[in-house]
Regions:
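Conserved hydrophobic ligand-interaction patch in extracellular adhesion modules
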Residues: 47-88
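Conserved beta-strand elements of beta-rich interaction domains across eukaryotes
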Residues: 38, 44, 67-68, 91-93, ...
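Intrinsically disordered, low-complexity regulatory regions enriched in Ser/Pro/Gly/Thr
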Residues: 25, 29-33, 53-55, 77-80, ...
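Extracellular disulfide-stabilized recognition modules
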Residues: 4-58
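Surface-exposed ligand-recognition segments of extracellular binding domains, strongest
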Residues: 79, 83-121
């Protein structure tokens, strides 16, 4: 596409994406924090299925790295009255946790005696 046509095409795409994001927000399917989009389909699934669905959508399972991201995830938990799987697993050191890729966990906001692995963390 040439100059002006290219700019018009980009503006049309931006407008369309903005409209789609608006619809998803209205349906409580996405929320945003810090430039990241957090999304859900609102369905219950097991951990492995959740990880796979996130990959299929071109993303990854949510891993809160600060209070704002934690709140974005909590938004879905409260709205759908459910729990959320996180991109965190138990480390080889009992009682310690790490990211799925093995990196050190730099943010946690657990309730007392959690996580317990019962979906109530």
């Amino acid at each position: 596409l040439a100059g002006d046509e290219n700019g018009d095409f980009i503006r049309q795409l931006e407008h369309r994406i903005s409209r789609l994001e608006g619809v998803l927000r209205l349906n409580k399917m996405i929320t945003e924090f810090g430039g990241k989009i957090f999304a859900t389909n609102g369905k219950k699934a097991d951990f492995d299925a959740t990880v796979e669905k996130c990959k299929e959508a071109g993303g990854s399972i949510a891993t809160p790295r600060n209070p704002g991201e934690n709140d974005a995830i909590l938004y879905f938990v409260k709205y759908f009255n459910t729990y959320a799987y996180l991109g965190i697993k138990q480390s080889p050191i009992p009682g310690k946790f790490q990211l799925l890729d093995g990196a050190q966990l730099s943010y946690a906001n657990w309730y007392s005696n959690e996580p317990s692995g019962k979906g109530e963390e």
